[in-house]
């Protein structure tokens, strides 16, 4: 054992990326304080360091959409809670369909995501062009807009989750 690492803990989490940090954060929020996060190098040194940090709320299933919506709300509040910068902001997102099959899939997504409380709507091609002036719209079938989709710094958000876990 390395010096300073306890020989036991109620919960041991292997991996100090955003997933491990989130597990630690949520366990401590539920009253489990004896949590140990192990990382082979430094926190966020693996996959998290390379992640894009996109926070999209429209997912393939109701459960995943609900989880993604929870995550977006958490990221929105985390910086204030922990006084740790996360880089979270909400520029919104656009999804486009180039064929009828994809457009039907997106319309089902609009219906499903609306039941979870995601602000989501279909947009016309002229509005799409306002958002994205260089887009070629004549071969598109449809588009949707989610104004509260965001982006975060995965490294900073991980550190905020760790700080939140330490604070309990």
Predicted region positions:
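Helical element adjacent to the flavin cofactor pocket in flavoenzyme catalytic cores
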Residues: 144-168
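Dinucleotide-binding Rossmann-like beta1-alpha1 core, especially the glycine-rich loop
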Residues: 53-131
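Short, flexible hinge/linker loops that cap or flank conserved catalytic cores
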Residues: 3-6, 29, 88
């Amino acid at each position: 054992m390395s010096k300073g690492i306890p020989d036991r803990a109620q919960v041991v989490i292997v991996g100090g990326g955003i997933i491990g940090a989130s597990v630690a954060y949520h366990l401590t929020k539920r009253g489990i304080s004896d949590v140990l996060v192990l990382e082979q190098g430094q926190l966020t040194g693996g996959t998290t360091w390379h992640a894009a940090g996109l926070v999209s709320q429209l997912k393939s299933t109701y459960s995943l959409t609900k989880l993604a919506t929870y995550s977006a709300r958490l990221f929105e509040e985390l910086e204030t809670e922990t006084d740790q910068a996360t880089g979270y902001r909400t520029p919104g997102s656009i999804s486009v369909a180039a064929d009828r099959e994809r457009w039907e899939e997106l319309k089902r997504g609009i219906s499903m995501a609306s039941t979870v409380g995601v602000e989501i709507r279909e947009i016309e091609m002229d509005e799409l062009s306002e958002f994205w002036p260089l887009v070629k719209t004549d071969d598109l079938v449809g588009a949707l807009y989610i104004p509260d989709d965001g982006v975060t710094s995965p490294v900073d958000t991980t550190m905020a989750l760790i700080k939140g876990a330490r604070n309990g």
